Amino acid sequence: MTERAVLAGGCFWGMQDLIRKLPGIESTRVGYTGGEVPNATYRNHGNHAEGIEILFDPEKTSYRQLLEFFFQIHDPTTPNRQGNDRGPSYRSAIYYVDEEQKQIALDTIADVNASGLWPGKVVTEVEPVSDFWEAEPEHQDYLEKVPNGYTCHFPRPNWVLPKRAATE
């Protein structure tokens, strides 16, 4: 059974390059989501975030594991910024497809905040999924085409997210 996830965490090139390598990832595509402009493009995406749509096998990588990796590879504590990229297009967001994903997202954020792994509080938006406008072909799998291209995403070494104690 395939599940869908939609995430935003800065420039979509680096997010796609790392997430597509996880076990059970069936496909990824980058695009624009979370805003109001119809038929969004790179030159005209209004208030959309650069996002990634992920189709995955939850038997190989659970939604929780996917979110833990998401929080490991980008800084969720900086509003509208990742690395040198600034502006609302680069915000951190989780776009849930159902109430179960919403609850997992909120629980994971609470665990990240309680862990102290990041120096500040998580500012990641949690919103229902809306339209996802696929980005232009040159943006798809960009870092496979340009292996030394720009990215500000990387797995933090020894980054393991503990779950909060039941009393928290």
Swiss-Prot record:
Reactions it catalyzes: L-methionyl-[protein] + [thioredoxin]-disulfide + H2O = L-methionyl-(S)-S-oxide-[protein] + [thioredoxin]-dithiol; [thioredoxin]-disulfide + L-methionine + H2O = L-methionine (S)-S-oxide + [thioredoxin]-dithiol
- GO cellular component annotations of the record: cytoplasm
According to its UniProt record, the EC number is 1.8.4.11
The entry's active site is 11
- Where, by residue number, does the polypeptide cross the bilayer? none
NCBIfam families tied to this protein = msrA
Matching PANTHER family: PEPTIDE METHIONINE SULFOXIDE REDUCTASE, PEPTIDE METHIONINE SULFOXIDE REDUCTASE MSRA 2
Describe its function: Has an important function as a repair enzyme for proteins that have been inactivated by oxidation. Catalyzes the reversible oxidation-reduction of methionine sulfoxide in proteins to methionine.
What name does this protein carry?
A: Peptide methionine sulfoxide reductase MsrA 2
